[in-house]
């Protein structure tokens, strides 16, 4: 009677090899997931870095036509969402020829003086203008706000002419508008007074600093003043051009989505993060379930002893040439040992 035993060491080796294969698969999956997430965060950090491209201009910079020397775009002078940097030129021109005709309302000029001021969206700007004449009192005020600019100028001639001028400007978004206006002016000569009174001019300048906001409204103003003397009467005509613009809501949204023109937008980064996180978790869960089922189906139930019945092999060399197990009830169990 032969007594055969199964090599438990071989079974243990096969079980351990299967276990090591499963652990290796899990390690590979976790490593791939970590590399994917790391790449995503590196790309997100790279996309958040500012990209300075001086060859192109973002779409929210509105061109301004019809102005001379009013606009000076510089990347160091504007914030995100701002319109740009404007230089506003104010010209005061006085008639110097002998023609005192006032029929056209606008007079040619032969001399001019220029005052330049630079408003910005984050600091207060001051504009001062002074003008003196023997028979004129001039008051000029300039108020800068985030929504509009107002220019009020009044000239009074003493003793024989009164000229009133008022101008109010408006801002329009998102287009750029140039408004030129001349107010009503009345001349009331008074010949009863022959006294010449010399009055010094008074100039008042006031400014208020604008409040910074994400959508900044910027405006520039160009003022030209013409003056002429007609039979002892001083006639002043002021022409004011106001250019105001502000970025629209669609431009602001496009700037947020483009994120300085490089990489994925904010919404796309959120979508990619959700897809990577949820998809990676589902993939790891499926692999874990498959590995568990495979391990469960491959369990070995071959432990213990295996007996052969007597004279079952009949001298054959084939290993499985008999019935496994002691199943013959007539067999003597004691003879097997």
From Swiss-Prot:
User: Where does the record place the region Disordered?
Assistant: 124-224, 241-265
Pfam families tied to this protein: Mid2
Task: List the ranges whose topology is Extracellular.
Answer: 43-269
Motif Calmodulin-binding is found at 301-314
Q: What does this protein do?
A: Cell-surface associated glycoprotein that acts as a plasma membrane receptor-type protein which senses the presence of matrix. Binds to calmodulin in response to environmental conditions and initiates a signaling cascade that activates CEK1, thus promoting invasive filamentation. Involved in the maintenance of the cell wall.
Disruption of the gene: reported phenotype: Shows defects in invasion of agar medium and attenuated virulence in a murine model of disseminated candidiasis. Leads to hypersensibility to the glucan synthase inhibitor capsofungin and the cell wall disturbing agents Congo red and calcofluor white.
Q: Where are the transmembrane segments?
A: 22-42, 270-290
The UniProt regions of compositional bias labelled Low complexity, in chain numbering, are: 124-220, 241-259
Q: Name one GO molecular function term.
A: calmodulin binding
Origin superkingdom: Eukaryota
List of glycosylated residues = 53, 65, 87, 100
Q: How is it modified after translation?
A: Cross-linked to the carbohydrate polymers of the cell wall. O-glycosylated by MNT1 and MNT2. Also N-glycosylated.
Which gene name belongs to this protein?
A: DFI1
Alphabetically sorted, this entry's keywords are:
Cell membrane, Cell wall, Glycoprotein, Membrane, Secreted, Transmembrane, Transmembrane helix, Virulence
- Record note on domains: The GxxxG glycophorin motif in the transmembrane domain is required for CEK1 activation and subsequent invasive filamentation on agar medium. The cytoplasmic C-terminal calmodulin-binding motif (residues 301 to 317) is important for CEK1 activation and subsequent invasive filamentation on agar medium.
Protein name, please? Cell-surface associated glycoprotein DFI1
Q: Where in the cell is it found?
A: Cell membrane; Cell septum; Secreted, Cell wall
Give me any GO biological process, just one. invasive filamentous growth
Topological domains (Cytoplasmic): residue ranges? 1-21, 291-337
Q: At which positions is motif Glycophorin A? A: 273-277
